[in-house]
Design a protein with these regions (language model features):
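Internal alpha/beta scaffold segment
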Residues: 2-24, 33, 45-66
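Charge-dense, low-complexity intrinsically disordered segments
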Residues: 3, 42, 108
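Residue-level recognition of the N-termini of beta-strands and the immediately preceding loop/turn
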Residues: 25-28, 131
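A structural signal for short hydrophobic beta-strand segments in well-ordered beta-sheet cores
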Residues: 28-30, 90
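Carbohydrate-binding surface patches
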Residues: 30-31, 36-44
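Rossmann-like S-adenosyl-L-methionine
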Residues: 46-172
C-alpha cells in the first residue's frame, strides 16, 4: 500500500480493536482521490453512540472521509465530515482530465499506478486520429476518456448505470 493508506493501518487496527463489537465489521473499503481518502466500514450490527463518536474522531484525526454500510450498497452513507459532498476526484494530468467518483465506484486505489496503466494502454494502442475505439467495461471513463484525446471516436460500454452516469459527467 502507498501513503496515505499505508499510514492508516496501525490507527485502523487500534480503532477497530477499541470498538464495542469489532467482529461485526467484516471489511473496510478504501478509495483514494488526489487529496482525499474515504473509508467505507461494512458493519453487521448497529453501531453504538460511543462507537460512532470513535469513528467521527478517527475521521477528524486522520483527515479521511468516513462512510458506513450496514446492509447492501444502497445503504452506504457518509458520517464524516458532515457535508453533502460524497465524491472524490483524481487527475490524469497528461490528458487534461479530472475524474469525479464515489468511494463505491471501481477505481485503482493507487493513483500513480493508475496513471502508469493509462499511459501504457494509450502507448500500446498506438492510436491513429482516424481510429474508432470500443472500450468494453469502461467504468467511469478512466481509459476511454484518455483514449478520446487521440482517436476519432471512442465508445464505452458499461453495465453499471451509476458508472455510466459518472463517465458521462467526467466526459463533460
Amino acid at each position: 500500500l502507498v501513503d496515505p493508506v499505508s499510514s492508516l493501518i496501525e490507527p485502523l487496527i487500534k480503532l477497530i480493536s477499541g470498538l464495542s463489537e469489532p467482529r461485526t465489521i467484516p471489511q473496510i473499503e478504501v478509495a483514494c482521490g488526489d487529496n482525499d481518502v474515504a473509508l467505507i466500514f461494512r458493519h453487521m450490527a448497529a453501531m453504538s453512540n460511543e462507537d460512532m463518536q470513535k469513528l467521527h474522531s478517527f475521521g477528524r484525526e486522520q483527515s479521511v472521509q468516513m462512510f458506513l454500510q450496514p446492509e447492501g450498497l444502497d445503504s452506504t452513507h457518509k458520517i464524516f465530515p458532515e457535508d453533502d459532498n460524497h465524491l472524490l476526484h483524481y487527475r490524469l494530468p497528461d490528458y487534461g482530465l479530472v475524474f469525479q467518483f464515489s468511494p463505491q465506484d471501481f477505481t485503482q486505489v493507487n493513483l500513480a499506478v493508475n496513471r502508469q496503466m493509462v499511459a501504457r494502454a494509450v502507448a500500446l494502442l498506438d492510436i491513429d486520429p482516424s481510429d474508432e475505439v470500443f472500450d468494453a467495461f469502461c467504468g467511469i471513463g478512466n481509459f476511454s476518456l484518455a483514449i478520446s484525446r487521440f482517436a476519432k471516436k471512442v465508445t464505452g460500454a458499461e453495465q453499471s448505470a451509476t458508472s455510466i452516469a459518472r463517465a458521462r459527467d467526467n466526459a463533460r
